[in-house]
Amino acid sequence: NLYWATCPLSNWFIHRQYAPLNLMHSMGLKVCIGTDSLSSNHRLSMIDEMKCIMSVFKEIPLADIIKWGTLNGAEAIGADNLLGSFTIGKKPGVVLIENADLATLSLTEQSISKRLV
């Protein structure tokens, strides 16, 4: 299986452009989200990467972006039998996203993440 990794804030930091995530989404490609490193990013934050995608690619639903940051990443590294979703037998980390807009199912500038488990 082929997965496309994107680190949008790093892409902007280095190239001042983003991968064509709207096209990749419309084609049904498997995308996963990363942060790259501090040499090409101001901080390592998955929620910031997700907020960036939401602000630039408004047509991509939050549910898909969350999947890109969870299950798709686990599948890409071959760890989906342990991580990436709440399934019996798995032991995923649990991260709470606070200050999301539940009416529009979107992240806001105030959205933050907090690791619970």
Label the predicted regions.
Residues 83, 107-108:
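Charge-dense, low-complexity polyampholytic segments
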Residues 7, 17-99:
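His/Asp/Glu-enriched, well-ordered alpha-helical/loop segment
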Residues 101-107:
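Short, Lys/Arg- and Gly-enriched loop/turn segments at beta-strand edges
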Residues 112-117:
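Short peripheral tails and domain-boundary helices/loops at the edges of structured domains
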Residues 12-15:
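Helical hairpin unit composed of two closely spaced alpha helices linked by a short loop
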Residues 1:
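Acidic (Asp/Glu)-rich catalytic clusters
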Residues 17, 108-110:
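Composition- and surface-driven signal marking solvent-exposed, interaction-prone regions
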